[in-house]
Amino acid sequence: MAALSGVRWLTRALVSAGNPGAWRGLSTSAAAHAASRSQAEDVRVEGSFPVTMLPGDGVGPELMHAVKEVFKAAAVPVEFQEHHLSEVQNMASEEKLEQVLSSMKENKVAIIGKIHTPMEYKGELASYDMRLRRKLDLFANVVHVKSLPGYMTRHNNLDLVIIREQTEGEYSSLEHESARGVIECLKIVTRAKSQRIAKFAFDYATKKGRSKVTAVHKANIMKLGDGLFLQCCEEVAELYPKIKFETMIIDNCCMQLVQNPYQFDVLVMPNLYGNIIDNLAAGLVGGAGVVPGESYSAEYAVFETGARHPFAQAVGRNIANPTAMLLSASNMLRHLNLEYHSNMIADAVKKVIKVGKVRTRDMGGYSTTTDFIKSVIGHLHPHGS
């Protein structure tokens, strides 16, 4: 999404909706974001943009090392403010969470690794990852699934976008034991948030020149919850007559993605479905190591891998694929209006993959993470030496 102005067009679209009162908070936030851009421009004059970095768990720290090494070699004017938050390394507390939130709110932009959520219930249902999303209102997760030239997969020349609502739905952390051995889990679906993510998807399609939006749902079974989501998507679709609108049941969508993914352009869906489809679609173009992602609120932008996987079994083995994180970092630079550096890094990563001499194990090669980083750095200035 292009720079900080991307938030402005989204907010203007939301404010122009039929119920302006529903978007009043976003309008106020957009004004704050505009002010933050002025602050960022001041920082740029001084030499760097402040960005919050959250390495996370698993191979996250190794991937962030790759980002820092490539940024250093490319002379990117970004200053990382690094924080550590982990539920599995005893590095989590309310104080640490507030420190991270404070940094992210001040900088408006962050790059993060996967914060692993343990299976065990320890008295708190909401993970730190989920709490960060809620407190920053990171309602829209965007994953651009695109084939990488030179890397052959079963389906090539894919180009589709998955937009996921990620502040409600099944991830509402509302569970309780109503009777011994009986657990009730509540799925929350609201008109305001369903309208908001639908408008985001159609605005995204309009801005990016895409022709179709597919709403993914299970309204045939969850007639009220997913029924409301689907109704909101249908209502918003009427405001965009130039964008083709389709609906598809989630289970059929999974099958269609495997059989004929070329039929899709932009897909919009509730929280849990988005989490599943993100990972499924990433597998179509090479897996979790090659697909970047990002999350947006009206004020903040967070850049991460598209398929959130800590890859704990690879920790310390120097085999993690930094492609997804480097491409996400490139998208972050574009968001900051650092187009030159963004293109330089993205082009270097894609050249390494296209040449095919340096590939990590997940891509069928034997190269290490370090090998990949060095190769990317070597392709940053192909005509400069």
Curated annotation (Swiss-Prot):
Disulfide bonds: none annotated. GO terms for biological process: isocitrate metabolic process; tricarboxylic acid cycle. It is found in: Mitochondrion. The modification N6-acetyllysine is found at K199. Keywords: Acetylation, Mitochondrion, Transit peptide, Tricarboxylic acid cycle. Pfam families: Iso_dh. Gene3D superfamilies: Isopropylmalate Dehydrogenase. SMART domains: Iso_dh. It comes from the Eukaryota. The heterotetramer and the heterodimer composed of IDH3A and IDH3G subunits can be allosterically activated by citrate (CIT) or/and ADP, and the two activators can act independently or synergistically. The heterodimer composed of IDH3A and IDH3B subunits cannot be allosterically regulated and the allosteric regulation of the heterotetramer is through the IDH3G subunit and not the IDH3B subunit. The keyword Mitochondrion applies. Its main location: mitochondrion. Plays a structural role to facilitate the assembly and ensure the full activity of the enzyme catalyzing the decarboxylation of isocitrate (ICT) into alpha-ketoglutarate. The heterodimer composed of the alpha (IDH3A) and beta (IDH3B) subunits and the heterodimer composed of the alpha (IDH3A) and gamma (IDH3G) subunits, have considerable basal activity but the full activity of the heterotetramer (containing two subunits of IDH3A, one of IDH3B and one of IDH3G) requires the assembly and cooperative function of both heterodimers. Heterooligomer of subunits alpha (IDH3A), beta (IDH3B), and gamma (IDH3G) in the apparent ratio of 2:1:1. The heterodimer containing one IDH3A and one IDH3B subunit and the heterodimer containing one IDH3A and one IDH3G subunit assemble into a heterotetramer (which contains two subunits of IDH3A, one of IDH3B and one of IDH3G) and further into the heterooctamer. This is Isocitrate dehydrogenase [NAD] subunit beta, mitochondrial.
